[in-house]
Amino acid sequence: MKFLLTGGSGHLGANLVRRLLDDGKDVRVLLREGSNNAGLDGLDVERVFGDLRNPEALKAALRGVDRVYHCAAKLSTVDGGEQELFECNVIGTRNLLRAARDAGAGRVVVTGSFSAVGHRHDAPSDETVPFNPFDKAMPYEKSKAGVEHECLKAVVEGQDVVVATSCAILGPNDFKPSRMGRTLADFANGKMRAYIPGGFEFVAARDIVSGHLLAMEKGRTGQKYIISSRFTTVDELMEIFERVTGRRRPRLRLPPPVMAVIAEVTQAVQSTFFPSRPQRLTPGAVRILRMHRRADTTKAKTELGYQPTSIEDAVKEQYEFFIGQGWIDGKSPPLARKAPATEETKKRALA
């Protein structure tokens, strides 16, 4: 049985492809030319290149494929870029689902986002809470809601599609690295000057991988399943970082309203003068942390047999991975240092 995986070089994809290979699966990965694909270096996978926005490229990628994991997505917490997000995430998913159907592929598991689940103020959100596009939301959140709409349309047309909804991922094989990965590296290297209170749902890399495998094996067609390890406040996360790295958290704990203003100004300046530079703490990210959105994972546990593991273990694994890549100075950390990556790998991954 051949599996196609999109987004194989991302944080989720790099962990999922390794699990599939460990399980003896035949894996083909769809990659974009010119992207940072270091996460697949040295792996025994078939590589095909193409863009989700190009239906012809997808026809070739799906040829002979039995099952599909669609993990690729453009991520952004910036208030802008609506058209590109729509084309990459919504149109890209539509194209992939059609190509999979035309190729006769079986089940497609699509990675969803907890950002596209509605917010309850008085209780954790489950899969039944609808996303309200008229609420204040980032273009990325709206695009991921659009992705789920495309999945439902495909199901109505007879296609076997299941959505595995991801939260913020922590864990190893973070080659790019992710926003949370950069935060951990900054903390470990003593470069984090301040933080803000808040909280969000986090998922260990091994857990979100397990959730995708379970969705493929046991999920019901047309259903989505929220996969999270646990809700964690920023203060709790700082405590975990302290235990793992041996460093103290920053003394400066900024009030969220102050940070929201700073983020607005920073986004305006950076978008104008440094548009290619990644924006870390955006107004959208601050808003999400302030919401304290909690997830109800009962459905995944009941229907799939999903069992979450430890967030602290995930942070340890991510930290050890970064040491192995040479991205942490290692002066104070208590964990064993692995062989450093080459200078070429470091530059490519941090680009």
Please tell me what each predicted stretch does:
Residues 3-23:
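N-terminal Rossmann NAD(P)H-binding glycine-rich loop of SDR-like oxidoreductase domains
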Residues 34-41, 45-91, 99:
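NAD(P)H-binding glycine-rich loop region in Rossmannoid oxidoreductase-like domains
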Residues 83, 88-140:
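Conserved Rossmann-fold NAD(P)-dependent oxidoreductase catalytic core, especially the SDR/UDP-sugar
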Residues 95, 146, 179, 196-216, ...:
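Substrate-positioning beta->alpha
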Residues 112, 149-172:
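Conserved beta-loop-beta element that borders a ligand/cofactor-binding pocket
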Residues 131-135, 182-203, 207, 219:
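A conserved pocket-lining segment of Rossmann-fold NAD(P)-dependent short-chain dehydrogenase/reductase
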Residues 205, 239, 266-271, 277-307:
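Conserved C-terminal active-site "lid" loop/helix of NAD(P)H-dependent oxidoreductases
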Residues 211-279, 297, 313-351:
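Mid/C-terminal beta-alpha module of Rossmann-like enzyme folds, strongest
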